[in-house]
């Protein structure tokens, strides 16, 4: 498989656009930070692919967050990213999770929150219930509510690789639902193994060899964590100084860990004094 690449394409004979994402390294970095149960590894892979596909639809520079929450054994699964296709994610759960657990089994009464944060302009947030059998269907529901353009997704993950495909009707005065349904029928024949092993040109040829397809230059997808020593210091400063000094007195240091990438930032007494005096820590230990 071509690793960590998103491809966009257009149908010249229909007002429909498509996306194809294939992920391996970035997926492994997301799920490698914690000992996730297999079903959660698969869910995070699908969520990572979905977020990458959603990110490619952004018409601005900025950030995106796709968050699943609920009152079930999985309380949170989230992928954060930006328009440069830099992604990171985590999940939180309790107890054992069955390999065949459904979305309802995992999240109970759950919902999906998609937050778009432009570098300039107002933030947008959309919320849909996790009341469909698959994550792909829930994302389709989001598009139906927010953009009201016919949209379809196919998401796959197996703990090693993740992939997804996306079709959407372009805004137009004409009715292209028949074209869209035809292309969806073709796309629905895709198999996970094909997405995990073939490059984009081969996949598109197999699916759409009788269609006129224009494939654009590939876009690299990567794992990127935004944690830093400065952010950790800022987080410490929000805590009461006496509480932090009590930790320092007991442990001789204050340690901050990143849930996304497992980086650790260690602050000694001099650092803590500097944080509350100036807002930064002097040391560079990580």
Swiss-Prot record:
It is found in: Cytoplasm. The keyword Cytoplasm applies. Keywords: Chaperone, Cytoplasm, Disulfide bond, Redox-active center, Zinc. GO terms for cellular component: cytoplasm. GO terms for biological process: protein refolding. It comes from the Bacteria. Under oxidizing conditions two disulfide bonds are formed involving the reactive cysteines. Under reducing conditions zinc is bound to the reactive cysteines and the protein is inactive. CDD domains: Hsp33 (cd00498). One of its GO terms (molecular function) is protein folding chaperone. Disulfide bonds join 225-227, 258-261. Pfam families: HSP33 (PF01430). PANTHER family: 33 KDA CHAPERONIN (PTHR30111:SF1). Redox regulated molecular chaperone. Protects both thermally unfolding and oxidatively damaged proteins from irreversible aggregation. Plays an important role in the bacterial defense system toward oxidative stress. Belongs to the HSP33 family. NCBIfam families: PRK00114.1. This is 33 kDa chaperonin.
